[in-house]
Amino acid sequence: MAMLWLIYEGILQYSAPQLQLLPHLLLQQSVTTTPLANMAVGGQGAFGVVDYQSLNIIERPQSGSVQIEGTTDSDVNAGLRWGVKQKEYGALFAANYLKQQGDANFLNGSDADRKKTDILFKVNATSLLGARSPQQTEFTYQFIDDDSYRSLLGITAADWQQDSLQLYSATAQDNHQGRQHKYQLSHQVDLGDSRVISDFYYQSYSQQLDQLGAFNGQNIGLGTLYDIAAFDRNPSVNGDDINMLVQDNDYSAFGAQTQAINQYGEHQITYSARYHTDKAEMRFGDQTALWQADRSIVRDESNSVLAYTDDATALTSAIDSLWRWQGMQIKLGLTYEHVSVNREISLVFAGLDEADFSDSDWMPQFGVLYDAGDWRFSTDIRRAWAAASAGNLTQEAQESLHYQVSAQYASEGIKADLRAYVQEFDNLHVDCDSYSMCVDTRLLTQENIPDVLSYGIELGLGYQWMLGEFELPLGLSYQYLSAEYQTSTCTDIQGCVLEGDKLAWLPEHQLQLSAGIEYAQYQLNLVAAYQSERDFSQYGSELQRVDGQWRADIAANYDIDKYHRLYVRVENLLDESLVTSASNSGIRVENGRISYLGYQWRF
């Protein structure tokens, strides 16, 4: 139930995890979600991760593709991938450029533009002459540049009912600029019954972020939101004062990790170790501006308000073992992590405190799996732990016990998966995020919620139906989640809650249906997703509830031949007004219906 941490190529951030960019879909090889825990990446990953892997070098002398698509909103996306593999050497170059205009509506005629450039380069070499064991060394470089409209301000409920895609022109200059570089050297050696994988990495990220922070000297709340809406509808002759929160942040990380996978007959033992250090230099400023009668914005010079540097160093070691006897498998694991955290203040601000502490703990795991042919049954118990961040005044770690039982069935095109789990949190970390618009010291802090109980059920069904020359893949996924506070508590970020209250924002029920048809060179796929009503009574919000929502997407492909493909995709087919967040800073929604037409050439 805790937030899933994002990792890319096994790299997990500690300081300022929000300072990162994810690669475009066309440059991803796979995305793997581990909702329960991934101990190998340390304490943060012990609460689940979403792991992005970049494109692999294809084992072919030459391969590649060119793809271009446009949308009904005049968006353009173009991508290129080219790879070679000659004897012991291989290389890959991939790039993608995205330009989006968006379908948001500003009364001053502005656009919610986005431009994003991705570049990926890889080169590898397999065993050279004289090598005693098969091995491979690979170097990866990745570059991502993002320039986009990014605002946390929503709209009032009345404006949402009238035009859900409206944006207030006070945010027309809310902008994000980010640039990320990543270098990674990986080495793998096969020693017969064992395999050793090692990685060395360095990454840097620079961010400039301007966002509306105050209106007429007051922080954004429900009252000021209505005032902003009123001015946008009927601007005053003299205009109104606004303040921009200006950020100039830099992040860097370096680390090394290794994993040794040893096979002893049917049994397997994996040893892993990791060293990671990162630093986030955060600089905040205030910039006054005049929102004029023509809805344009004239900005003054910005003034520095606060500045601090967070750095963290983590040492992680783990041992995982898998013991097999006939149809029985027993999994035993133990992880240890030591984290040192420091915060230095270079420009003092009220509510911002320095920090210098370290923490460590053990994370054991026990699991049993029984394979009965078509059926598989398993149970898993583990303890999860994550050190506090520099903004946690009490320096309390996040701790929980996870329990899970599951059953899987697979036979003749039918797949079924049923899981039930319980998570007992002794302490749960909360940060200022999409629940509310934070432009004060809440941005700098991490708070603690004691005693949270979460439990749920997940059901997945899949069937591959063959009807003559037609292939019809069908799927169903259902999730039930309940998360409750076990103790009454108050925090600055979420406000006050009572024992038995539900955690805000989490839907109890989620359902996804998928259906497709494949015939010769034609493919058609439909996906429909449902989320039950969600509650917003916490995080200082007076917006109590958002009703259940449906979203449907459809995609169709036509393969002209083995080299050329045409495709059409329609997202939000029903053109629903889908709420992504709601608080005293307003309601924000996804884009409306948008259609894509694309072409792909493979060679």
Segments predicted by a language model, with ranges:
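Transmembrane beta-barrel wall of Gram-negative outer-membrane proteins
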Residues: 63, 70-99, 107-151, 175-190, ...
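Short acidic/polar hinge/loop motifs at secondary-structure boundaries
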Residues: 8-35, 121, 155
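Surface-exposed extracellular loop regions of Gram-negative outer-membrane beta-barrel proteins
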Residues: 88-106, 114-118, 205-253, 312-348, ...
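Structural signature of Gram-negative outer-membrane beta-barrels, strongest in the C-terminal barrel
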Residues: 251, 264-278, 287, 291, ...
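A beta-strand signature from Gram-negative outer-membrane beta-barrel systems
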Residues: 21-63, 602
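Conserved C-terminal beta-signal and adjacent last beta-strands/turns
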Residues: 83, 89, 124-128, 142, ...
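Membrane-embedded beta-barrel scaffold of Gram-negative outer-membrane proteins
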Residues: 186, 195-213, 369-384, 396-466, ...
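Gram-negative outer-membrane beta-barrel transporters
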Residues: 263-266, 324-330, 339, 410-416, ...
